[in-house]
């Protein structure tokens, strides 16, 4: 009987915690459903939960869809990007060297090659330092890592090798799956939605190398 009571108490506490989290997300969803934007803090909190794997996939799908249907506000983009950077794997580099990036948001449905990646390689051959941040294809035909893998480039190098490549060769790839591990919780939902989401905008804003300049397409 005592064991049963302890189990019941633990279960009750667990359900209470789950309900609090669900209620918070439901409030944000209700706000979006009524065509109201979220504040910077609300969005940051929501995406922090996402990157910790605390959001149910069905709820996450609804959340991403509602955000897209409303149109993204500056506070929503800023809050989400701040949460993503905060959850990212840290990377340090030589800040005395200017580093740039050429990047697109993806999701154009044109089924073309990943042009930004090829452009970045060309720029590196001309003496520029390019920190290419990217992922496998989610809402596009090809992603940056897809192109580089086909070219024989190792997209999962260590931080030290990545740093050396950036300094010595002028080009290094920062694989989103390595530096933004919390994205794995959103990946299946993004794949199922098969459309661009706010994550397409966040990618160019969250380069782990903290680039000095960026050409965004």
What do the predicted segments below correspond to?
Residues 101, 130-134, 155-158, 173-175, ...:
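General beta-strand structural signal in soluble alpha/beta enzymes
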Residues 22-111, 126, 130:
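Acidic, glycine/proline-rich low-complexity segments that act as flexible tails and inter-domain linkers
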Residues 6, 13-24:
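Short, Lys/Arg-enriched N-terminal segments with co-localized hydrophobic residues
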Residues 161-217:
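Phosphate/diphosphate-binding glycine-rich loops and adjacent basic-rich segments that engage nucleotide
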Residues 64, 113-169:
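A glycine-rich phosphate/pyrophosphate-binding beta-strand-loop-alpha-helix module
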């Amino acid at each position: 009987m005592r064991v049963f009571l302890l189990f019941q108490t633990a279960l009750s506490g667990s359900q209470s915690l789950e309900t609090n989290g669900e209620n918070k997300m439901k409030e944000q969803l209700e706000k979006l459903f009524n065509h109201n934007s979220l504040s910077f803090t609300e969005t940051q909190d929501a995406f922090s939960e996402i990157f910790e794997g605390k959001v149910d996939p069905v709820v996450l799908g609804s959340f991403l869809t509602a955000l897209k249907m409303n149109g993204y506000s500056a506070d929503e983009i800023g809050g989400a990007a701040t949460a993503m950077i905060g959850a990212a794997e840290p990377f340090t580099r030589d800040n005395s060297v200017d580093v740039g990036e050429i990047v697109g948001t993806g999701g154009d449905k044109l089924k073309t090659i990943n042009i930004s990646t090829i452009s970045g390689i060309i720029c590196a051959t001309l003496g520029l330092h390019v920190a290419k941040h990217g992922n496998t294809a989610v809402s596009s035909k090809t992603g940056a890592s897809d192109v580089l893998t086909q070219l024989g480039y190792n997209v999962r190098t260590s931080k030290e090798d990545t740093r050396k490549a950036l300094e010595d060769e002028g080009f290094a790839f920062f694989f989103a799956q390595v530096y933004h591990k919390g994205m794995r919780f959103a990946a299946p939902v993004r794949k199922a939605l098969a459309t661009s989401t706010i994550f397409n905008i966040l990618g160019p804003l969250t380069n782990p190398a903290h680039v000095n300049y960026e050409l965004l397409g």
